[in-house]
Amino acid sequence: MYVVLLRLALGLYSVGLLHSILTVIKRKPTFFKPALAAVVAGFACHATSIVLRGMEVQYLPITQRYEAFSFFGALVALGFLIAYSKYRISSLSVFVFPLIFVMTFVAELSYDPSPAIPGILRSNWIYIHIPLIFFGYTALFIAFAAAGLF
């Protein structure tokens, strides 16, 4: 079920990607509100997909390539939604929506149903360390995109 939700999120994120492409080509915002609604719905599907994957494999799903790309894509979506709700900078979406789509697409391409976790990643420390790294990368990218706008 989590794979279906990830594919649904990818489809919804593609609306955001289309918004970004059309905005760059036409040099004016093109259907931002539907794209924002699609990204919100995509994030909900994406987060549910990550939770369901974690429930199935019985560990925090960030250790495999598929899981890491998926988690990072979801965090970037969450980071954008938080930044947008606070600052209302819609032009940030031109940079963020393509990254969300690409990360989710790469996660979909590298999907591996094997729940086997490498031995080196069985430490409890990894469950604190890796999410903090991804939060840092997300904050760095959002700040980079915002700085690039100004």
Regions found by a protein language model. Give the residues of each.
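Polytopic transmembrane helical bundles with strong interfacial aromatic enrichment
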Residues: 1-150
